[in-house]
Amino acid sequence: MARYRGPVEKLERRFGVSLALKGERRLAGKSALDKRPYAPGQHGARKGKISEYGLQLREKQKAKFMYGVSEKQFRRLFAEAARREGNTGVLLIQLLEQRLDNVVYRMGFATTRRFARQLVTHGHILVNGKRVDIPSFRVEAGAKIEIIEKSKNNPQITRAIELTAQTGIVAWVDVEKDKRFGIFTRKPEREEVVIPVEERFIVELYSK
């Protein structure tokens, strides 16, 4: 299944939670979810008891859409997490958090992961001094992530940094905003990653 490219705010209304897909609009309280906090449709979707499988699928979809990964990428990451020693769900979240596009977003250089992905694919990002244009590139502890020189005054990046002042920066990155670079200091602990996803249901889904 390809990466979702449809109306992103409909996804948030479908799931009833913010997936950080519309950064500035969400912060301003102007997102579709803020205005219409019910599922898309004339009267919204009817509420009913969701099955166990439905719940598992829902959590997987939320994680996929939030991090902007395809089904193939998601399955590959889950398989890697399952092979490692430790809590599979926590390891999965850590692997998702280590994606370069996500790290650029977490450092506050983009208001959404989607824009962060564009920055990466268009060649605006350096990793340890080398240009990397692969959004799924895995960032390891100690890596330096930097905006290329000619893009440091990009108005969208500047605006993202300004908005970050309202939300703050996560604890596992150190950022020099004025110099437009940051250090991915470590993998996050699960309790530090505030996302509306219960990964245990994803583990149950793929463990069948």
UniProtKB/Swiss-Prot annotation:
One of its GO terms (molecular function) is rRNA binding. SMART domains: Ribosomal_S4, S4. It holds the Pfam family Ribosomal_S4. It comes from the Bacteria. One of its GO terms (biological process) is translation. GO terms for cellular component: small ribosomal subunit. Transmembrane segments: none annotated. Residues 98-163 form the S4 RNA-binding domain. The keyword Transport does not apply. Keywords: Ribonucleoprotein, Ribosomal protein, RNA-binding, rRNA-binding. Part of the 30S ribosomal subunit. Contacts protein S5. The interaction surface between S4 and S5 is involved in control of translational fidelity. One of the primary rRNA binding proteins, it binds directly to 16S rRNA where it nucleates assembly of the body of the 30S subunit. Belongs to the universal ribosomal protein uS4 family. This is Small ribosomal subunit protein uS4. It comes from Campylobacter jejuni (strain RM1221).
